[in-house]
Amino acid sequence: MAAMGGWAGIGEMLVAMMPEAVPPLKAVLKDTGVDANDDMMMIGAVKPPKEHAFVAAHQFRWLLSQVNYPKLGDLCWLVIPCALTALDHWSPDVKEQGMISFMHIAKNVKATELSLYEDAILDACCHNIPADDELWYRVVEVSVLLLTCTQRSNPRSPWYDRVLSEMLGHLERQPLNKERRVAWLTLIGPVFDSMGLFLLAHFRLLFSLFFQWIHADDDRTVLLVLERVHTVIKLTWIRKSPYTSRYRNYDTSYRYLLFLHLLNLEASNSLYLYLGWWMSLFFCIKSQPHGRAVR
C-alpha cells in the first residue's frame, strides 16, 4: 500500500497521514474528558460514548509508535497536544496510553524540540502523581524520563524541586504502600543523579521515608533503600577538600564515620542536626595532625 501511494515505507506513509488522523482522535478524547467549564457549555449536547475514548487513545498510541527519530521531531506540534489531552483524561486506561505515548516521544525527539512544551508536559506529570495504584509505576516512569530529558543540564531547575517534592509528599501520606515505594525506589535514580548536591533541600522528607522503609518486612524494599542511601551520600559527600586526603587511606575509620552519620540521622531525623554533623566532621578532620585517622 505504501509503495502504491508513492511512499518509501509505512513510516513515511503514516507521517503523511498524521495531520489528518490525529485531530479527530484528539477531538474524541477532549469530548469524553472531564472539564467543568465544557460541561456547563455542553448541557444537552451529545457526547461520544466513553468507549470511544479508549479506542481513540489506543489508536493514537499505535500511530505514534510507528514514527521514530528523526521524523517524529517534525510532528511535535501535532502529537504533543493530543498526548496531553490523553494525559488529562479521567480514565486510567486513557491516561496510561498518554504516558506510553510521552515515553515514546521523549526517546525519539531532541530535548530542544520539546522545549516549547516542557512546562505543560511537566505540569501534567505533577498533576498525575496522586494517581491510582495501577498507574503509579507509569507515572513515576514517565515523570523521571521527561524530567531528566528536558532539564538534564540544569539541576537548579525548579521542576526538579517541584516533581520530587510532589512525589515525596505523596509517599509520606502512604509510607506503607509497598507497590508505590518499590516502584519509586526502582525508578528515581536518574533524578538523584541529575540533582546531585541539590538533594540537600529534600533531606528531611527523603531520610524520613528511608528510615521508615529500612524496617520494612520485605527484602526488596530494604535493598533498594540501601542503594538509594548509598547514591545520596555519594552525591552529597564532602569532596575536593584539602583535608580529605588525611582520611582517604583509613577505610575502617571512613566506614565508622558513615555508620555514625546514619545513626545520627535515624535518631534525630533533623536536617539541622545533619548539617551540624557535617560541619563537626569537617572541623574534626581539619584539626587532625597530618596522617592521623579521624576517630
Model-assigned labels for residue ranges:
Residues E12, I43-H52, P70, C82-Q97, ...:
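Short coil/turn segments at helix-helix junctions and helix-capping linkers
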Residues L14, M18-P70, A83, C149-S157, ...:
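Eukaryotic alpha-helical scaffold "rod" segments
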Residues F198, V232-L235, R239, Y250-H261, ...:
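Hydrophobic alpha-helical segments
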